[in-house]
Design a protein with these regions (language model features):
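H-loop/switch region of ABC-family ATPase nucleotide-binding domains
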Residues: 195-196
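Conserved ABC transporter NBD signature motif
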Residues: 52-65
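Conserved ABC ATPase signature
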Residues: 135-139
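ABC ATPase C-loop
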Residues: 152-153
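Helix-to-loop junction immediately C-terminal to a conserved catalytic motif
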Residues: 44
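Catalytic Walker B motif of ABC-type/P-loop ATPase nucleotide-binding domains
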Residues: 160-163
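A short, flexible loop at the N-terminus of ABC-type nucleotide-binding domains that lies
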Residues: 1-15
């Protein structure tokens, strides 16, 4: 439920229950207002449910900081550092984090190690490492989304939650994203895709749920 600042509350999710195994990819679709974004925020610990609990490997979510990564619907909200390089390193845990989300701090690293992390992450999502010195606002919407994903993958999470991951991507970028995610899934990464439609993600996901008025079926 949401607290409206009144004696009344607005129920958003109702008896939602799901299990995501290691190496499994699940797709949840739903119309606007169905509770998709609320679900993603509950699963990452950004919202605390009024009833029920979220666990990872039997541990409560509040003890799993750094194990779950969220790719937000609007990538620009995740990119709040002055350059592509600093944003990727911050998302990977090597630098102060600004904005929403919890990232496990991994300590200081050398310039060379930072360059290696950034180069590998950018190449993984099909971006030229030469873009690392660019300001975020110099990028296209599709490039921003790929930079955000690069940083999340560089943090090596156990679970990756993607909220409308195909927004702003052309066909070639979509195909690349699916290929990258499928490779990580085969390596054991659990992936939850939340979207208003299939967006081609049905080729990646082996399970499909539908969220309607807060009920998952």
């Amino acid at each position: 439920t949401y607290d409206l600042g009144t004696p009344w509350e607005k129920p958003v999710l109702r008896d939602v229950s799901l299990i995501l195994d290691p190496g499994q990819a699940m797709l949840i679709t739903g119309d606007n207002g169905s509770g998709k974004t609320t679900l993603s925020r509950v699963l990452t610990g950004l919202l605390v449910p009024t009833w029920g609990r979220v666990t990872l490997g039997g541990r409560p979510m509040e003890r799993c900081v750094g194990d779950v990564a969220l790719s937000m619907q609007f990538a620009r909200l995740q990119l709040q550092r002055p350059s592509v390089r600093s944003d990727i390193l911050a998302a990977a845990g090597h630098g102060p984090r600004i904005g929403t989300g919890s990232v496990h701090r991994k300590g200081a690293i050398s310039r060379e190690e930072g360059d290696r992390i950034v180069d590998e992450a950018m190449e993984l999502v099909g971006l030229d490492p030469a873009l690392a010195t660019r300001g975020i606002d110099d990028l296209s919407g599709g490039q921003m989304r790929r930079v955000a994903l690069a940083g999340l993958l560089a943090s090596h999470p156990s679970v990756l939650i993607l909220d409308e991951p195909m927004a702003g991507l052309d066909v070639a970028s979509r195909d690349l994203l699916i290929s990258v995610l499928d490779e990580r899934r085969r390596a054991g990464l659990s992936i939850l895709v939340i979207s208003h439609d299939l967006e081609g993600m049905d080729s990646l996901c082996d399970t499909h749920g539908r969220l309607a008025e807060g009920v998952l079926s």
